[in-house]
Curated annotation (Swiss-Prot):
Protein name in the entry: Peptidyl-tRNA hydrolase
Organism, as annotated: Chlorobium chlorochromatii (strain CaD3)
Chain's role: Hydrolyzes ribosome-free peptidyl-tRNAs (with 1 or more amino acids incorporated), which drop off the ribosome during protein synthesis, or as a result of ribosome stalling.
MF terms in GO: peptidyl-tRNA hydrolase activity; tRNA binding
SUPFAM superfamilies associated with the record: Peptidyl-tRNA hydrolase-like
Gene: pth
Presence of the UniProt keyword Transmembrane helix in the record: no
Subunit structure comment from the entry: Monomer.
Active-site feature positions: H19 (proton acceptor)
Residues given in the record as tRNA binding sites: Y14, Y64, N66, N112
First and last residue of the signal peptide: none
Length: 190
């Protein structure tokens, strides 16, 4: 079994925000496979799909971004999945809109959801798919309002394409493994 974990904040007020791009990819993956989310023990929503012979859980933590690690650990324990069988999908302020990077490990890079997962694991060795939300237009000192803000009209078309690419990358990870997905989906710009 594999887990595809999209990070974000619960609540309709966060729908469509830069910080919730992980939720958007999880939603796109579930919709692509006609799956729906159900609540699991209050910490996360999950949808289950089958990709070939592989069972896949799509997870959306309901603990808010800064406490994502609690939900990720709960889901991994429930499904009895190792760190090598997960990919975490999140926003990356340092990547331009229209780019994504899949990595086998690394630092949190300022992403508080990843930071909390690393703290809960005691390790940074887990796959993460970072999706660029761009910081070039961020007002000085406006970090929170920027990541919790919505994409511009111009960015929305790039994000729609990127969401589909990220969804397909997650599918590739589940079917063929991390190395294969990295070779096929790491981009400079789509």
């Amino acid at each position: 079994m594999k887990l595809i974990i999209g990070l974000g904040n619960p609540g309709t007020e966060y729908d469509g925000t830069r910080h919730n791009i992980g939720f958007a990819v999880a939603d796109a993956l579930a919709a692509h496979h006609n799956a729906s989310f159900s609540k699991e023990k209050g910490r996360y929503l999950s949808a289950k799909i089958k990709l070939g012979s592989e069972s896949v859980g799509i997870i959306k933590p309901m603990t808010y971004m800064n406490h994502s690690g609690h939900a990720v650990v709960a889901a991994m324990n429930f499904y009895k999945v190792a760190r090598t069988e997960i990919v975490v999908i999140c926003d990356d302020l340092n990547l331009p809109v229209g780019t994504m990077r899949l990595r086998p490990k690394g630092s949190a890079g300022g992403q508080n959801g990843l930071k909390h997962i690393i703290e809960c694991f005691g390790s940074n060795e887990f796959a993460r798919l970072r999706i660029g939300i761009g910081s070039q237009n961020m007002p000085k000192g406006g970090f929170s309002s920027f990541v919790l803000g919505k994409f511009s009209e111009q960015e929305k078309s790039e994000i729609a394409i990127m969401t589909v690419s990220a969804r397909d990358c997650a599918i590739d990870f589940a079917l063929h493994g991390l190395g294969h997905a990295m070779n096929h989906f790491n981009t400079s710009k789509l």
